Structures are given as structure tokens and as C-alpha cells.
């Protein structure tokens, strides 16, 4: 899990939000899901076929949902009151595991 004191408005341009914000994220560092990389051509400049296969394993899905819930708990804690604004992504209405 990491927290940075800004958030990105547009990932393509890397422009920051126009208001004070933060980004908090979690990662499954030892995933069970397996992806693949396959060579498609003898040409060394040709792009390989990459299948990331993120979150294919239920263990990874559960870890990410748990991490997300932990992030919300940390941000909702009283010591964060002075710094916390409204959650805008994914938004406070997202509550069910399937939505997360």
C-alpha cells in the first residue's frame, strides 16, 4: 500500500487535479494469477503477445478487496480528518466486493 499527496486528473497527460488530493493504492505483491509472454515473430523488434491476466485467481481478488477495505479504514480514521476530502474514485457508493 502506498499514499502520494496528489491525484492525476488525466492519465494520458499526467495532469494533476485542480484541488488538494491524495492517491492511495494497494498491490498484490506475490500474486497467484499467472500471465504469459509469447514471441510472435523471429523479428527482435516485433512486439510479443502479452497476457497480463491480473486478478484471475480468487486469492488475488480477495487480497485486493481486503486491501481496498483497509485503505478506506485508514483514510476514514480520525487522524485523517484534517486531510480527507470526499472520495471521488471509485466513490463512496461502491461498497460490494463485486463492485470493488
Task: Please give the residue ranges for each predicted region.
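FAD-dependent oxidoreductase catalytic-site/capping-region signature
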Residues: 1-100
Amino acid at each position: 500500500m502506498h499514499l502520494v499527496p496528489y491525484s492525476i486528473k488525466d492519465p494520458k497527460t499526467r495532469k494533476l487535479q485542480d484541488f488538494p488530493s491524495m492517491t492511495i493504492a494497494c498491490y498484490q505483491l506475490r500474486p497467484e494469477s499467472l500471465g504469459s509472454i509469447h514471441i510472435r515473430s523471429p523479428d527482435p523488434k516485433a512486439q510479443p503477445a502479452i497476457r497480463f491476466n491480473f486478478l484471475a485467481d480468487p486469492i488475488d481478488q480477495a487480497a485486493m478487496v481486503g486491501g481496498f477495505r483497509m485503505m478506506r479504514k485508514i483514510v476514514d480514521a480520525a487522524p485523517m480528518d484534517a486531510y480527507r476530502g470526499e472520495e471521488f474514485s471509485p466513490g463512496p457508493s461502491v461498497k460490494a466486493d463485486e463492485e470493488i
